[in-house]
Amino acid sequence: MQASDIQPRTVPRHLAIIMDGNNRWARREGLPGVAGHRAGAEVVREIVSACESRGIRYLTLFAFSSENWGRPRAEVRALLALLSRYLRNEVAKLASDGVRLRVIGRRDRFSPRLQRLIAKAEAETEAGERATLTLALDYGGRWDVAQVTKSIARDVLAGALRLDEVDEEAIAQRLATADLPDPDLCIRTAGETRISNFLLWQFAYAEFWFTEVLWPDFDETVLDLALADYAVRERRFGVRPLLHQY
């Protein structure tokens, strides 16, 4: 199935991607690990454009997890340097294409310079209405739930929220993704079949598609395979379809 064969109504409104396999790609090619991350960053540019052209309104990329701080220091520095370069080089194109960039996750552990760069990129693309690209940086699903819990506790103690008002909606409104619809589809590359602490609450009814393809090898063809598979799935959201009554 080609991109032109996928009907707009079957395209996921919100696509999340767990980008995995950069280091394995570099080892396969006999290159240092940072080369894999550079190659992966190039793929991000292509996939952002591909999603926009296919009518996917929201794209969320797991770019730097809370657990990534535990990687070798040199690798962390390389990852953050690539992130800084992406923010500097891609913002103008995102803005001209009408793509809003937003970042979710902790920012306080990043350098003040990177924090300013993130804020600047968000401000310069704020008017984008065609699509929203969300980068999950220093993000963890458990952190997200914990910060919601703290927010609710503060509001209850302050009298701004009654205990009987704490429901799913109250939680959803305080998540890092509060202004986004829940993901419809999550793609994970490199043969891994776990969600690795990503969007734990938000994935409640998401569809998942796993591929052996390493992220630097991911392209529009693989994306279309995922979209074609998603297009024929029946999403039930936990509800069994009613049988026809005669």
How should each PLM-predicted stretch be described?
Residues 1-246:
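Flexible, compositionally biased loop and terminal segments
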